UniProtKB/Swiss-Prot annotation:
Active-site residue list: 286, 320
Presence of the UniProt keyword NAD in the record: yes
Conditions for induction: Expression is sigma L dependent and induced by arginine.
InterPro entries in the cross-refs: Ald_DH/histidinol_DH, Ald_DH_C, Ald_DH_CS_CYS, Ald_DH_CS_GLU, Ald_DH_N, Aldehyde_DH_dom, Proline_metab_enzyme, RocA
Family label: Belongs to the aldehyde dehydrogenase family. RocA subfamily.
Record protein name field: 1-pyrroline-5-carboxylate dehydrogenase
EC number(s) from the headed UniProt entry: 1.2.1.88
Amino acid sequence: MTVTYAHEPFTDFTEAKNKTAFGESLAFVNTQLGKHYPLVINGEKIETDRKIISINPANKEEIIGYASTADQELAEKAMQAALQAFDSWKKQRPEHRANILFKAAAILRRRKHEFSSYLVKEAGKPWKEADADTAEAIDFLEFYARQMLKLKEGAPVKSRAGEVNQYHYEALGVGIVISPFNFPLAIMAGTAVAAIVTGNTILLKPADAAPVVAAKFVEVMEEAGLPNGVLNYIPGDGAEIGDFLVEHPKTRFVSFTGSRAVGCRIYERAAKVQPGQKWLKRVIAEMGGKDTVLVDKDADLDLAASSIVYSAFGYSGQKCSAGSRAVIHQDVYDEVVEKAVALTKTLTVGNPEDPDTYMGPVIHEASYNKVMKYIEIGKSEGKLLAGGEGDDSKGYFIQPTIFADVDENARLMQEEIFGPVVAICKARDFDHMLEIANNTEYGLTGALLTKNRAHIERAREDFHVGNLYFNRGCTGAIVGYQPFGGFNMSGTDSKAGGPDYLILHMQAKTTSEAF
């Protein structure tokens, strides 16, 4: 009998012992920098000449590690290894597969601060953000293991006299898992193990900006007893091996988290049936958002301001759930904007290794340049009230930036920026607020601050997002508590950490026996 699932507690860094322990882990990780991480194909460690050089976004001179990269020949080798491993892995009992996840969760829990420290160094995450990322990875392992145990018997169906009908789930085959930089442990681990625990084998292509933490997680899965060939680690260029694997006739499904542009490209290419392909490929995609915090006229205004600020600037706005738009009722607009600006100016921006840092850098030069471009656009679309400056002399730092009086159809209100920039718009009334909330091509997260029960119930039906929060910010979904995933161009309507997510990685089979 398994213990009932509960999410992994976050570390309380106000306790001196926790602060000390995390500092010691950071010191240890600093001694591990600059190592080489090979490909892992069928358990074989393969070094290649071409490397991804992972750098610290807070210190461009510091190299976190060197990850070998796969070409198409090695990607094909990984595909063949996964195909061979699938024949035996799919026949393993669900209990056995789940137990490997439980063991991996225990290992990760013991090494929690170590993995969080890698996230500080490689992803530029402040302590609390890094800790939450690692906790979420543990949650995915624990939750999906339990979900597989629930699904192992299939689902009940009716039987008539003289027959026995059964309905059960089978694995799909070989999957391609393409993970993002912004949750390089949690989302990478969650998408990988969801495929694995359901009996599939995978090729894992981690984000170019964060290959080291993915390599460390592969080590954890090996230690937990995962057989060779089930998880094949192949960093590489998206244009070279990404397209190759998405289009491969033996690929059964693609699990992708990232930008709208890349997600649409994958969806289109996966849809084309290749010579020798025996199925229609399944695509599981989460592709970002343009998420809105709504503030009603009777809201708690201090709560509203903090919800706007922390939703916009947590992890430098590099969350698909980030509240990059705020829509405020005209009756309280000036006061909420004033409070949000004042709170923003108290945020500390700096090296994420410092426990007092609230906001670290953006992930890399391309991101820095993109965000700074949008800040320039914002200067012509709204009133700059906070931030607007960047400094890339040592790392990729951008001050938390607020633009007010932005038109609802402006680029700042419509396009995903993925940085510490929030656009604020004034609404005439609640109807107008909802109209603006639904006027983008995305539909991932949203929040409504109000004391009006009728408005809450209306938003529950009419605010068209996959994750809607009332009287809090729009980030911070917890596995098993707030299953995560959105509508429209935010993805394929999958809900990570939810009761039906694993089923996306399986196919149902009906058997009927007459007697």
